[in-house]
Amino acid sequence: MTIFYLVFIAVIIIIILYVLYLRPLYSGTSVIKGNTQYKADKLMIIAHPDDELIFGSKELIENPGWKVICITNGSKKSVNKISICYLMGHRSTYRRDEFINMMNLLHCQYEIWDYEDNYFNSNWNLKQLKNQLENLLREKNYKMVLTHNLAGEYGHTQHKTISKLLYDINPPNLYTFYYDSNTINPYLVLIKKLSHVYQSQDKIIKKNYKYIEHQSKIAVKNNSK
């Protein structure tokens, strides 16, 4: 009985580890595009809806003319299926809808791609994703390409993976989000109002408020082609 119990526990642990860390994530090719009426000469590439608010809203407000690419949450297949909101029965497209509302308020072009949102792993089809990013960057010579840093800001594995892919592609004028404790974001009042768009992410935004308060960017060195 003891051996059976230990084997059972081991199997459960293996299943949990596989589901959280090892399983391949859904990697779809569908793209939702919006606000194409707005001109864009700068490109922001983020992993999840709300990343643009937490790490890049100062830039979006201060320097209009952005196209924002959100890599995840394009369809029911690419939502985070182990998130609290999903498990509590929220509609499956809630984060996508919140992102679109934010883009409308900020007058940004946007695309939402169809890669699965997950906190614990980033096991996407990386060859496919890299090709998609390369095709995106060939569309236009952007004045700035702004994305996650190699540390993933607070260590998020999907942030790290997107940053690494863009470092490998090495587009001109590549910048990453940067936490600068010596600066204070001058748009905190406006950003607080905008944050209400992300009702589902209220706790996450409050938890990571310091990244909003001290938003900055930094150029990637040796990035000329």
From Swiss-Prot:
Query: Which source organism?
Result: Acanthamoeba polyphaga mimivirus (APMV)
Q: What is this protein called?
A: Uncharacterized protein L374
TM segment ranges: 2-22
Q: Which residues are glycosylated?
A: 73, 222
Pfam families xref list: PIG-L
Write out the coiled-coil annotation as residue ranges. Answer: 114-146
Topological category with respect to the lipid bilayer: Single-pass membrane protein
A GO cellular component annotation in the UniProt record? membrane
What Gene Ontology terms describe what this protein does at the molecular function level? Answer: N-acetylglucosaminylphosphatidylinositol deacetylase activity
Protein's cellular compartments: Membrane
Protein keywords: Coiled coil, Glycoprotein, Membrane, Transmembrane, Transmembrane helix
